[in-house]
Curated annotation (Swiss-Prot):
One of its GO terms (cellular component) is cytoplasm. Keywords: Cell cycle, Cell division, Chromosome partition, Cytoplasm. Component of a cohesin-like complex composed of ScpA, ScpB and the Smc homodimer, in which ScpA and ScpB bind to the head domain of Smc. The presence of the three proteins is required for the association of the complex with DNA. Coiled coil: none annotated. This is Segregation and condensation protein A. The lineage of its organism: Bacteria, Bacillati, Bacillota, Bacilli, Bacillales.
Length: 251
């Protein structure tokens, strides 16, 4: 009969086969019987050979090692500490076998978790970030300063990232939300009272995402109405007043 090679029940190796047999026998991994496991393993290998299947050499090596370990179990041996187990391949012991099986099982379970995460990720689809410049009204691109709309967007993005990644260690207390008109008045009053401010410096406390968005929109509207102007200042943006009276705000 022509010899051919098969993957025995999709086992990845001798340790995988051993785990399968231990699970089938419902034996505690920490309290395995070397004699029973060896008999089951050798019987499985012999069955494969009886079918004239090409058994990988690593399975045969494990069979020989288990038989050697079984014979050693018949002799009185000293109790071995799990924390100081000799290499199983160099000096086969029951504790060494258990340790190898435990490590292999841990890797196998981790591989299964990663496989599940990979399959879940394949069901997700990434989306490229939108170009917000396409929504800009060409008639409102003059911001009465040395900044472009994209500069303001970059400043907003920096602040948004700070909000997203900063860890809040104190208890969160929800602040009263403001409308766009109310925030415009609040921003303009702050700029007038402080004779200017920076975009980051305006937030005396850690803002929420909602507060950050409405504040950014308020700044855009105030710039559009020529109430405040924006100027580049290092990595921040300087806001300064362009009108003398606060009541000139068109809200």
């Amino acid at each position: 009969m022509e010899s051919y090679s098969v993957k025995m029940d999709a086992f990845e190796g001798p340790l995988d086969l051993l785990l399968h047999l231990i699970g089938k026998l419902e034996i505690d991994l920490y309290d395995i019987s070397v004699s029973i496991v060896t008999d089951q393993y050798v019987s499985y290998i012999r069955a494969m050979q009886h079918l004239e299947l090409d058994v990988a050499s690593e399975y045969l090596v494990m069979a020989a090692t288990l038989l050697q370990l079984k014979s050693k179990q018949l002799l009185p041996v000293e109790q071995t500490d799990f924390e100081d187990v000799p290499d199983f391949e160099e000096d086969p012991t029951r504790e060494g076998l258990i340790q190898q099986l435990i490590e292999y099982k841990a890797y196998k379970e981790a591989a299964l978790v990663l496989k599940e995460k990979e399959e879940a990720r394949l069901e997700l689809f990434s989306k490229q970030p939108e170009d917000l410049m396409t929504y800009l009204d060409p008639d409102n691109q003059d911001f009465s300063g040395n900044l472009s709309f994209s500069d303001l967007l970059r400043a907003y993005e920096k602040m948004r990232q700070r909000v997203a990644w900063k860890v809040r260690r104190s208890k969160t207390v929800k602040r009263e939300e403001r409308t766009l008109e109310q925030q415009m008045i609040h921003v303009s009053e702050y700029v007038f009272a402080n004779e200017g401010t920076t975009f980051f410096g305006f937030f005396t406390e850690q803002p929420t995402v909602e507060e950050l968005v409405v504040s950014f929109l308020a700044v855009l509207e105030l710039v559009k109405q020529c109430v405040v102007a924006c100027e580049q200042m290092s990595d921040d943006i300087l806001l300064r007043a362009l009108v003398k009276e606060e009541n000139q705000i068109g809200v």
